[in-house]
From Swiss-Prot:
Primary localization class, coarse: membrane
One Pfam family per UniProt: Glyco_tran_28_C
HAMAP family reported in the protein's UniProt record: MurG
Provenance organism: Xylella fastidiosa (strain M23)
Topology class, membrane: Peripheral membrane protein
SUPFAM superfamilies according to UniProt: UDP-Glycosyltransferase/glycogen phosphorylase
Cellular location(s): Cell inner membrane
Protein name: UDP-N-acetylglucosamine--N-acetylmuramyl-(pentapeptide) pyrophosphoryl-undecaprenol N-acetylglucosamine transferase
Family: Belongs to the glycosyltransferase 28 family. MurG subfamily.
Function: Cell wall formation. Catalyzes the transfer of a GlcNAc subunit on undecaprenyl-pyrophosphoryl-MurNAc-pentapeptide (lipid intermediate I) to form undecaprenyl-pyrophosphoryl-MurNAc-(pentapeptide)GlcNAc (lipid intermediate II).
UniProt lineage: Bacteria, Pseudomonadati, Pseudomonadota, Gammaproteobacteria, Lysobacterales
Catalyzed reactions: di-trans,octa-cis-undecaprenyl diphospho-N-acetyl-alpha-D-muramoyl-L-alanyl-D-glutamyl-meso-2,6-diaminopimeloyl-D-alanyl-D-alanine + UDP-N-acetyl-alpha-D-glucosamine = di-trans,octa-cis-undecaprenyl diphospho-[N-acetyl-alpha-D-glucosaminyl-(1->4)]-N-acetyl-alpha-D-muramoyl-L-alanyl-D-glutamyl-meso-2,6-diaminopimeloyl-D-alanyl-D-alanine + UDP + H(+)
Stored InterPro entries: GlcNAc_MurG, Glyco_trans_28_C, GlycoTrans_28_N
Enzyme class: transferase
Gene Ontology cellular component terms for the protein in this record: plasma membrane
Length: 367
């Protein structure tokens, strides 16, 4: 399948990006594609048929080719045993796409199509670059890293041999003033930003209203902005109303730079892109990793920020989760100096030029 936006006919061989399945793979690829295209380098995308990338990538003016492929993890032993039979046709399909476009270099950001696409690239002698966003690498990138020319990572510790370049973030977030400048002279309620992601996080929707109700007996006033996902909006609004806590509940926040700039503290999951944004913005956080994340990668991501003093980590499966959350928020909401120290520590981890750095490496490895 081909969704044509950018012409395949060009004087220059394109860079081919392999990414899909989730926004965590797709958005870093789009950021790097934007840098390459701004330099006049054509980009073509290889994705999986019927997945998120088939709708998202063309909206950014990039041509996408798709192959039929699906994941095998989490589908039982029979799926694993049958993986070679399912993957081989996808590899051959990827090779046909590669022969058509003759890319100068192939870059994997992970996802269903990245495995067959990366293997096909190496079989055809094309340079392969891998970028892993999480500290616990996905199965596809673990395999491809063994044969890749360059292995890049968003966090230290993903691979034994790696180049830590960071995860791409939006330019408006990276351009925010330093925490000390933003926080200077602030008065009034402490500003708490809660991010549940596009699908929402029910544990946050349930816990925050209850905990903030308990904290209302303190001397610290709190202003709450809670992003909960469209499907859970009514439920979240109801939880705050029942708890008697005023909050601005939103299904989606379009201007994340403004939201981070506004916030004194963030409560959120620990996806790689979110943590890269927290660091680029320079804001402290309470991280609640999604416990069902593959290879527990969100917890490992969070531990990197915790070790640097930029965040605190809570596990939602702990029996005393509500008690821990109340204790942590009571301390942080009443301690502006600690919030500032966490924000500055986060900013110290930022790699705001990640997209440009990755693009430079891609161009150096082009044939």
């Amino acid at each position: 399948m081909s969704i044509v936006v950018q012409s395949a006919v060009t004087h220059f061989r394109p860079v081919m990006i392999l990414a899909g399945g989730t926004g965590g793979h797709i958005f870093p690829g789009l950021a790097v594609a934007g840098v390459l295209r701004a330099r006049g380098v054509p980009v073509v995308w290889l994705g999986a048929a019927g997945k998120m990338e088939t709708h998202l990538v063309p909206k950014h003016g990039i041509e996408i080719q798709t192959i039929a492929v699906s994941g095998v993890r989490g589908h039982g032993m029979l799926a694993l045993l049958g993986a070679p039979v399912r993957v081989l046709p996808a590899i051959f399909a990827a090779m046909r796409v590669l022969r058509r476009y003759r890319p100068r270099v192939v870059v994997s950001f992970g996802g269903f199509a990245a495995g067959p696409g990366g293997i096909a690239a190496r079989l055809m002698g094309l340079p392969l670059i891998v970028h892993e966003q999480n500290r616990a690498p996905g199965m596809t990138n673990r395999v491809l890293a063994r044969v890749a020319r360059r292995v890049l990572s968003g966090f230290p510790g993903s691979f034994v041999a790696e180049e830590v370049v960071g995860n791409p973030v939006r330019k408006d977030i990276a351009a925010l003033p330093a925490p000390g400048v933003r926080f200077a002279g602030r008065s009034g309620p402490v500003r708490l930003l809660v991010l549940g992601g596009s699908q929402g996080a029910r544990v946050m929707n349930n816990a925050l209203p209850v905990v903030l109700r308990v904290l209302s007996d303190s001397d610290v006033a709190v202003e709450v902005r809670h992003q909960c996902g469209e499907a859970l909006r009514a439920e979240t609004e109801g939880a705050y109303a029942y708890a008697g806590v005023a909050a601005r509940v939103e299904p989606f926040i379009s201007d994340m730079a403004a939201a981070y700039s506004w916030a004194d503290l963030v409560v959120c999951r620990a996806g790689a892109s979110t943590l890269a944004e927290l660091c680029a913005a320079g804001v402290g956080s309470v991280l609640i990793p999604f416990p069902a994340a593959v290879d527990d990668h969100q917890r490992r991501n969070a531990e990197y920020l915790v070790a640097a003093g930029a965040a605190l980590l809570l596990q939602q499966q702990d029996r005393a989760f509500y008690v821990y959350l109340e204790s942590v928020l009571r301390d942080l909401l009443s301690n502006p100096m600690r919030r500032l120290a966490m924000a500055e520590a986060a900013r110290g981890l930022a790699k705001s030029d990640a997209a440009e750095c990755i693009a430079e490496i891609i161009l150096k490895e082009s044939i």
